[in-house]
């Protein structure tokens, strides 16, 4: 008797099968149909969500190579003009006459992570020479107010001072003014906290030079109208926008197929030594570490090095007012709980961020998660197939080897991993629950740490049934992926850490040039303030 539940391949139910979540997160979005606008009309909205990954994906989205039709009609991504990626209508800018508070409000109002700052004190559109303000500047400002950053560790020599007052005296005056609630010009903090030079490319330049710059660790580049010295800026291209563009257009670029289907271990990208903070440490320690190391994110781990969460430089916006000031001196886990609850209130639903992958995750899966979560990095944890006794270096593969050699020998068909299985969802829920426990006023950070450690030890594994993502063994960033794309094109060695080292060298050279015998600048303790921007 035939099985009543079996279906032939021609069965309508079988033919109309919707793709699984794993398939949606592992394959690039389909190309637009001929009935729609051409392939140049992809949206580059900053408000990416999971729905944007799934839009239009009701057809068969199985893994494998790009179809023959797409390959024959494909284009070389390095030939794309930068004008295709610019959004002049979205270019928001401010001038150096803005206060730090006004600059911060601009970021929040327009949902930006960075904004160009004209050197003019009145004309925000004059961007011939400009700096940029982002949340790392806000973090520096906050740490100065709380005595966790010293002026002799910053670029005081870059400050513009009128009159006979020394630059250090002027800087001290500005900090004291801010401590008493006074407004400080944004130009002051920008010059104290210099970044990499603003690299500019004309609209008619091809994508490769920008890919190379962003793959070397530059976070964003400016797009100008033409190549003339005084050409106006028409747009800003960030790492996050570029990776979204490459993902949405991946089916146009058959040369990416091999990379997208390979695992991150086979491609040998990322770092096996990510910067971390323990969940029971004070939040202000995490902010200070990001300032010192010139990074924008830290992995939050427990004392067994199991991943518990993530803290980003953007999170500093939640502690800029006096009503949340106490969070600075509570545990990082406590802050994560607060942050998730606030996002849940704003979005109207629970928030369980997907911030980790394994070394067996395909690059396509990693990129899809980065785009869906609008993240700059994902933490790499031990694969569930790896025993607890496996070493961290073994768990992450031969990451210190030569990338180009790994690419040539990698398998062309990476596995489809079920990282969003029900077990994975419970992992994120458990991590959020651990953070929620930290927010209980009756529970100290030490108790939280003990509770989390107990959860881990009960299972006997770092990534098995503990309810946590697993033991941290690495990190993969937008810089790593964009550098991989650039390197795979011409074989030219790309250094993902170049820009970061330049930022740190700039800071170190400034410190060594300042006379540090002038004594301590800030008080050791700071008992009461009005917050960075008052009681908002």
Curated annotation (Swiss-Prot):
Keyword Ribonucleoprotein appears in the UniProt entry: no
Record field: compositional bias (Low complexity): 439-460
Any one of the GO CC terms: nucleus
One example GO MF annotation: protein serine/threonine phosphatase inhibitor activity
SMART domains associated with the record: CBS
Keyword Cytoplasm: yes
Ranges annotated as biased composition (Polar residues): 1-17, 42-55
Ranges of residues in domain CBS: 192-255, 267-327
Domain of life: Eukaryota
Subcellular location(s) of the protein: Cytoplasm; Nucleus
Region (Disordered): 1-72, 439-466, 496-536
Chief subcellular location: cytoplasm
Keyword annotations: CBS domain, Cytoplasm, Nucleus, Repeat
GO biological processes: cellular response to glucose starvation; regulation of mitotic metaphase/anaphase transition
PANTHER family in UniProt: AMP-ACTIVATED PROTEIN KINASE, GAMMA REGULATORY SUBUNIT, CBS DOMAIN-CONTAINING PROTEIN
Family: Belongs to the SDS23 family.
Its biological purpose: Involved in DNA replication and cell separation.
Protein name: Protein SDS23
């Amino acid at each position: 008797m035939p099985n009543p539940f079996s279906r032939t391949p021609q069965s309508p139910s079988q033919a109309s099968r919707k793709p699984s979540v794993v398939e949606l997160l592992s394959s690039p979005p389909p190309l637009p149909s001929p009935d729609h606008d051409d392939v140049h009309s992809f949206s580059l909205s900053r408000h990416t969500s999971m729905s944007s990954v799934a839009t239009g994906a009701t057809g068969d989205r199985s893994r494998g190579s790009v179809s023959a039709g797409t390959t024959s009609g494909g284009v070389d991504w390095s030939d794309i003009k930068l004008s295709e990626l610019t959004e002049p209508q979205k270019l928001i800018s401010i001038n150096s006459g803005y206060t730090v508070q006004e600059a911060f409000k601009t970021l929040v109002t327009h949902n930006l992570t960075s904004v160009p700052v004209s050197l003019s004190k009145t004309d925000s559109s004059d961007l011939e020479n400009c700096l940029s303000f982002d949340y790392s500047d806000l973090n520096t400002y906050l740490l100065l107010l709380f005595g966790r950053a010293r002026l002799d560790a910053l670029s005081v020599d870059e400050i513009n001072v009128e009159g006979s007052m020394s630059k250090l005296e002027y800087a001290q005056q500005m900090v004291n003014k801010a401590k008493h609630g006074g407004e400080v010009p944004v130009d002051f903090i920008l010059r104290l906290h210099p970044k990499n030079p603003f690299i500019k490319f004309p609209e008619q330049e091809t994508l490769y030079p920008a890919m190379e710059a962003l793959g070397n660790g530059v976070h964003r580049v400016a797009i100008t109208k033409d190549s003339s010295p005084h050409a106006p800026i028409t747009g800003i291209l960030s790492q996050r926008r570029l990776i979204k563009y490459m993902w949405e257009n991946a089916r146009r670029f058959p040369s990416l197929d091999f990379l997208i289907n390979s695992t991150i271990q086979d491609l040998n990208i990322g770092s096996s030594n990510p910067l971390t903070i323990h969940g029971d440490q004070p939040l202000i320690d995490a902010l200070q570490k990001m300032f010192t190391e010139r990074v924008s994110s830290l992995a939050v781990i427990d004392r067994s090095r199991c991943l518990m969460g993530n803290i980003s430089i953007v999170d500093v916006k939640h502690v800029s007012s006096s009503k949340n000031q106490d969070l600075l001196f509570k545990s990082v886990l406590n802050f994560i709980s607060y942050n998730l609850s606030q996002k849940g209130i704003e979005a109207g639903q629970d928030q369980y961020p997907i911030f980790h992958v394994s070394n067996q995750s395909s690059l396509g899966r990693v990129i899809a998660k980065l785009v869906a979560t609008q993240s700059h990095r994902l933490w790499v944890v031990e694969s569930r197939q790896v025993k607890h006794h496996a070493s961290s270096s073994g768990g992450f593969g031969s990451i210190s080897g030569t990338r180009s050699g790994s690419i040539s020998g990698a398998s062309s068909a990476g596995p489809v991993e079920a990282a969003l299985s029900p077990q994975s969802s419970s992992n994120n829920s458990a991590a959020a629950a651990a953070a929620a426990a930290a927010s209980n006023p009756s529970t100290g950070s030490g108790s939280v740490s003990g509770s989390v450690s107990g959860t881990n030890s009960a299972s006997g594994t770092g990534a098995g049934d503990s309810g946590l993502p697993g033991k941290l063994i690495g990190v993969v960033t937008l810089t790593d992926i964009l550098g991989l794309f650039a390197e795979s094109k011409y074989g030219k060695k790309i250094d993902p850490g170049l820009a970061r080292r330049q930022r740190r060298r700039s800071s170190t050279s400034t410190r060594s040039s300042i006379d540090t015998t002038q004594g301590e600048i800030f008080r050791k303790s700071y008992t009461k303030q009005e917050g960075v921007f008052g009681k908002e």
